[in-house]
Amino acid sequence: MYNNNSSTSSDSSNSEEKANAQHASSTDSTSEHTDPAVADEGFPAEQYQSADLEKQQLLIEEGPGGFPYITNPERFYVSLEPSDPRLAVNWPTHVKILHVALLAFTTLTASWGSSVFSAAATIFAAKYHIGLTVALLGMSLYVCGFASGPILWAPISELVGRKIPLIVGMFMFSIFSIAVAVAKDVQTVMICRFFSGFCASSPLSVVAAAFADMFDNKTRGPAVCIFACITFAGPLIGPIAGGFLAKSYLGWRWTEYITSFMGFFSTLCLLFMKECYSRTITEQEAARLRVEYNNNFIRAKSEEEYIDFKALAKRYLAVPFVLLFCEPIVFLLTLYMSFVYGILYLLLEAYPIIFAEKRHFSLGVDALPYIGLLVGVILGAALIAYFQGYYNRKLDANGGKPVPEARLPPMMIGSVLFPAGIFWLAWSGYYTHVHWIVPTLSGLLTGCGILTIFMQSLIYLIDAYLFRAASVIAANTIMRSLVAAGFPLFAVQMFHNMGIGWAGSLLGFIATALIPIPTLFFIFGKRIRLMSKNTVNL
C-alpha cells in the first residue's frame, strides 16, 4: 500500500485523478468521479473528494529542461505491511510446499549434472583415447563452474529477484548440456561442462535465499535442510542412473541428453513460480499502481536506489575473502565444509575402485552402494529435525532472535560419525573377502555426518553473520567448490598407490582432527562473535 503517514499523503497521491475529474466537470461534482478502488488502496473516499486541487498542483514543479519533478517523493512511496499476503513469508502453506517441491527439483537437476558424467568417464576416456584423470576433468570443471557462478547469480538475485536468475540459469544449463551431448571432441566437452556448471550454480546460489524469503526463523531450518538434502542427493543419484545409461545401447551421450531434458522441464516449471523476494514484490506492486492510477510518481523506494556495480563487485569479490581470512569462525567452518564437500566428490571415484575394481561389480551396479550414503543423508536430516525442538526453545528464550550456537549439537554428533564412517569404508573395502554390504553400510555414518556438518555450519554462518550473509556464503561456496573440483583428480592415484585402507585412513585422520571445531564454537562461539564487528550481536 501507499505510505500513509498523514492525510496529505492521501491527497497528493490522487492528484492526477483529481485533475481528470476537475477537467471533466466542476469541483463540486468530484464525488461522482470517485474511484472506489482508491479507498481499497488505503485512501478514504472523503479525503479524495475534499482534496484541495490547488494544493496538489503545488507539489509538482518544473525542473531543468522543462521536465516536471516532484518535491515530496516520499508521499508516493509504496510499501507492504509485514502481514501482507503478497509477501512470500505470508503465503499459504500449500503454496509454500509447492514452491519448495519446485525449487528442490531444480536443485536436484543442477547437482545431478555434476556427477552423472562421472559414471561415463571410463567409456568417454576409451572413446577419445585419453586418460581417466583427463576424463574426470569433465566433472571437476563442472564443479569449478559451481565456484565461479555465484559471483554472477547472487548479485543479480538481489537486483531483479529470485525468479529471473533461476529461469535464465536453468535454460542456459540445458543448452550447454545438449552441447556436451553433441560434442565431437574433448575440448568442446570440457568447455561446455564448465559453462553448464556455471549456469547450474544459479539454483545453488538462489534457492537457499528463496527459502529464507518464504520461512521465518522457526521454520527456516527444516526448509534449508531440504535444500541441503537435495544438494547431496543429486551427486549420489547421478552415478547410478549414469552408469546404466552409459553401458546401454543409448551410450554416454544420453547422460547429458537426460540432464538437458530435466533442465528444460525445470525451466518450464519455473515460469509458473511466484516471485518471493520482498523487494521485487514491492517494486512489482508499485508498477501495477502506476498503471492503475496513471501516476508515474508512484514507486518503491528501492527503485530510486543507485545501482553501484563497484559496491556489488566489492561485496561479492573483495569482502568475501576479507571475511574468509580475517574471521576465525568463517575460516574454520568454511575449511570444514570444504573438506566434507570434497570428500563427497572424492567418494564418487573411490566407490568404483572398491566395488568395480576389487569386487568386479558391473557398470551401474557399482554405483548402487551410493544408496547407503543417500540413506545416511536422510538420517542426518532426521537428526537435525529431532533437534529442531531444542533450537525453537532457545529461540523463544532469546525473544525470537537467532541463537547460532543452538544449531551446533547435531553437528557435534555428525563430526564424530563422519570419520567413523570413513574408517569403516576404508578397511572393510580393503579386504575383498568382507561382504559388499559391510562397506555399503558405512555410508550410513558418512552420509549422516556429511549432511549434519554441512547443514548446521551453513545455518550457523547465516545466523551469526546475518547482515553479511551474502558475502559469507559467496566465500564459502567458492572455496568448497574449488576443493570439491580438485579432490576427484587425485582420488584414483591416491587409492591405487596408497591402497584403499591407508588412503581412506588418511582422510579419516584429517576428519578426526576437525572434530573439535563445532564443540569449540558451541562453548566459545558467542565470545568470539562479540569480538567481531561483522557479526550480529544476538
From Swiss-Prot:
Which Pfam families does this chain map to? Answer: MFS_1
- Bias (Low complexity) occurs at 1-13
Gene Ontology CC: endoplasmic reticulum; fungal-type vacuole; plasma membrane
Give the source's domain of life in one word.
Eukaryota
Keyword rRNA-binding present in the record's keywords: the answer is: no
Q: Which family does it belong to?
A: Belongs to the major facilitator superfamily. CAR1 family.
Matching PROSITE patterns, A to Z? MFS (PS50850)
Keywords noted in UniProt? Endoplasmic reticulum, Membrane, Transmembrane, Transmembrane helix, Transport
Chain intervals for the UniProt region annotation (Disordered): 1-43
Q: Does the keyword Coiled coil apply?
A: no
Its main subcellular localisation, reduced to a broad class, is endoplasmic reticulum
Gene Ontology MF terms = spermidine transmembrane transporter activity; spermine transmembrane transporter activity; transmembrane transporter activity
Q: Which organism is it from?
A: Schizosaccharomyces pombe (strain 972 / ATCC 24843)
Q: Name one GO biological process term.
A: transmembrane transport
Q: Please give the CDD domains that the UniProt record associates with this protein.
A: MFS_Tpo1_MDR_like (cd17323)
Q: Per its record, how is this protein called by name?
A: Uncharacterized transporter C36.03c
Q: Which PANTHER family match?
A: MAJOR FACILITATOR SUPERFAMILY, POLYAMINE TRANSPORTER 1
Compartments annotated for it: namely: Endoplasmic reticulum; Membrane
Classify the protein's membrane topology as the record does: Multi-pass membrane protein
Q: Where are the transmembrane segments?
A: 97-117, 134-154, 163-183, 194-214, 226-246, 254-274, 328-348, 367-387, 408-428, 434-454, 458-478, 504-524
